[in-house]
Amino acid sequence: MWTQRNAVGNWLLVLTAVIGFLTFIWIPQTSAECQTRSIYCYECDSWTDARCKDPFNYTALPRDQPPLMTCNGCCVKMVRHQRSPYEVVRRMCTSQLQINLFMVDHVCMMESSGNGHMCFCEEDMCNSSKNLHTNGCQLHLIAIAVAVSWLMGQLLSR
């Protein structure tokens, strides 16, 4: 028998499904590739420039920091041989890499051995950070996914 409670539950279920679907369609499109505006990224390699090493001295005078380059993509920070005497840090712009950004999704990727990582970010000088974090779109997606899961659980428990 069709009741008002079933109608409201079904309406909420449909609304939740639509919001969830739109979120998974919209969010990847907004964050799938690096922004088109120019940003500044540090460009250095700790193998040849000690200023590039971690921890990065972002409070140093500009002349005592590695060079900044204009970037029409994302800033990148790569670390090899992490936490060892042979650690190498490289900071650059994605325009210097041949990589499919749709696969990267602006996160940190660990090297298969676990001894290194590559991180992407989209703000001026963001590749100076020791630990790069996920961008706002990813946090937004996680929050919506949690809300959708909670709503689905509430509806299915009736």
From Swiss-Prot:
GO terms for cellular component: external side of plasma membrane; membrane raft; plasma membrane. It is a lipid-anchor; GPI-anchor. InterPro entries: QVR-like, Sleep_regulator. N-glycosylated probably on Asn-57. GO terms for biological process: negative regulation of membrane potential; positive regulation of circadian sleep/wake cycle, sleep; regulation of circadian sleep/wake cycle, sleep; regulation of synaptic transmission, cholinergic; rhythmic process; sleep. Residues 1-32 form the signal peptide. Residues 128-158 form a propeptide. The chain crosses the membrane at residues 136-156. Residues 54-67 are annotated as: Loop 1. Keywords: Biological rhythms, Cell membrane, Disulfide bond, Glycoprotein, GPI-anchor, Lipoprotein, Membrane, Signal, Transmembrane, Transmembrane helix. Disulfide bonds join C41-C75, C44-C52, C71-C93, C108-C119, C121-C126. One of its GO terms (molecular function) is acetylcholine receptor inhibitor activity. Expressed in mushroom body (at protein level); overlaps with expression of Sh/shaker and nicotinic acetylcholine receptor (nAChR) components also involved in sleep regulation. Expressed in the adult brain and head. Enriched in the mushroom body, anterior optic tubercle, superior protocerebrum, antennal nerve and visual projection neuron fibers projecting into the lobula plate of the optic lobe. A lipid is attached at N127 (GPI-anchor amidated asparagine). It comes from the Eukaryota. It is found in: Cell membrane; Membrane raft. Pfam families: QVR. Glycans are attached at N57. Residues 77-91 are annotated as: Loop 2. Belongs to the quiver family. Consists of a single Ly-6 domain, adopting a three finger fold stabilized by 5 disulfide bonds. The first loop contains a region essential for protein folding or that is required for localization to the cell surface. The second loop mediates protein-protein interactions. Bifunctional regulator of neuronal activity in the mushroom body, and possibly other regions of the brain, that acts as a signaling molecule required for homeostatic regulation of sleep under normal conditions and after sleep deprivation. Reduces neuronal excitability by enhancing Sh/shaker K(+) channel activity; possibly by stabilizing Sh/shaker to increase protein levels, accelerating its activation kinetics, slowing C-type inactivation and enhancing recovery from inactivation. Specifically affects the A-type K(+) current. Interacts (via loop 2 of the three-fingered Ly-6 domain) with Sh/shaker; this interaction may stabilize both components of the complex and may be required for targeting or retention of Sh/shaker to neural cell projections. Interacts (via loop 2 of the three-fingered Ly-6 domain) with nAChRalpha3 and potentially other nicotinic acetylcholine receptors; this interaction is required for antagonism of nicotinic acetylcholine receptors. This is UPAR/Ly6 domain-containing protein qvr.
